[in-house]
Amino acid sequence: LHKSIPRVETRYFITIYEEEELKNDVLLRFAKLDFNLLQMLHKQELTEVSMWWKDLDFVTTLPYARDRAVECYFWTVGVYAEPQYSEARVMLAKTIAMISIVDDTFDAYGIVKELEVYTDAIQRWDINQIDRLPDYMKISYKVLLDLYKDYETELSKDGRSEVVHYAKERMKEIVRNYFVEAKWFIEGYMPPVSEYLNNRLATSTYYLLTTTSYLGMKCANKEDFEWLTKNPKILEANVTLCRVIDDIATYEVEKGRGQIATGIECYMRDYGVSTEEAMEKFQEMAEIAWKDVNEGILRPTPVSAKILTRILNLARIIDVTYLHNQDGYTHPEKVLKPHIIALVVDSIEI
């Protein structure tokens, strides 16, 4: 239960509790009403995110990109389901969808020279850089800059627009590391596992997503963002957890498409071990990372429990999305679809 998504477990526990002989009918009815009322808000938010995604029309203009708006929103409900985080969920869902577009540009479509210019343009974060880009990159570049401008406008209402800077810097960081990985793939370079992990931790997206998850939280102040920039142990553990679980789940697919610079392959070469032994090592790293996340939740820190809980919930999402070493993000029908239906499609019958 500790590694499960709280909102998912809430939905399933209501069904289980309903079968109990000694159930409290008033409490059960209240739980159902509470779930359905909050679900109505979640449905409204999903509609907003879906309409934003549809209006961008990436499915037509960037056909190489994954169409995962619903799955992106599901992740945000895992991070925070409470009604006061409505704005935060919408912001985070849009960011997850956007980083998927950027990732696919590096991973499946761009060539080195174009990717180098794209990377530099994002580092400069200036719309005047757009003319340097090929047409297909202009589309995602403009949307990316517009998105963060919208965040600044929205947060300025509460005098918090300056914290968007921290999310921008994390976006620049991940793009730099995407470019390194793209060169590895194109050049057929297999780095030492230490170099691999040093770069790939950033491209796990969890530095970016954790920072972004705080944008819409009015309780998150500049000091919280500063704390996060220092990459505290709990964040490093969560990023490592995301990286190694993803590497285990996607190994066969990446190997099948000729990608030699995978974590498993690098570890096998460096230590002269079999695939099974490398998998076991990565699983061990995941277990250690979970212990470090739990330690970080329990130990005194300069930030509040509300801030720490986002990191814990992001860890939980990884465990659910990659359950039984399946890539539930790329293939949501395998893992996430039943949860999505339960949380944002089907209401509970009163």
Swiss-Prot record:
List locations, semicolon-separated. Answer: Cytoplasm
Q: Which is one GO molecular function term here?
A: vetispiradiene synthase activity
Q: Which reaction does it catalyse?
A: (2E,6E)-farnesyl diphosphate = (-)-vetispiradiene + diphosphate
Induction is noted as: By elicitor from R.solani.
On whether Cytoplasm is a keyword of this UniProt record, the answer is: yes
Residues binding Mg(2+) 1, per UniProt:
103, 107
> Per its database record, what is this protein's job?
Sesquiterpene synthase that catalyzes the formation of vetispiradiene from trans,trans-farnesyl diphosphate. The initial internal cyclization produces the monocyclic intermediate germacrene A.
Q: What is known of its domains?
A: The Asp-Asp-Xaa-Xaa-Asp/Glu (DDXXD/E) motif is important for the catalytic activity, presumably through binding to Mg(2+).
Which protein family is named in the record? Belongs to the terpene synthase family. Tpsa subfamily.
What is the protein name for this chain? Answer: Vetispiradiene synthase 3
Q: Which organism is it from?
A: Hyoscyamus muticus
Q: What is the lineage of its organism?
A: Eukaryota, Viridiplantae, Streptophyta, Embryophyta, Tracheophyta
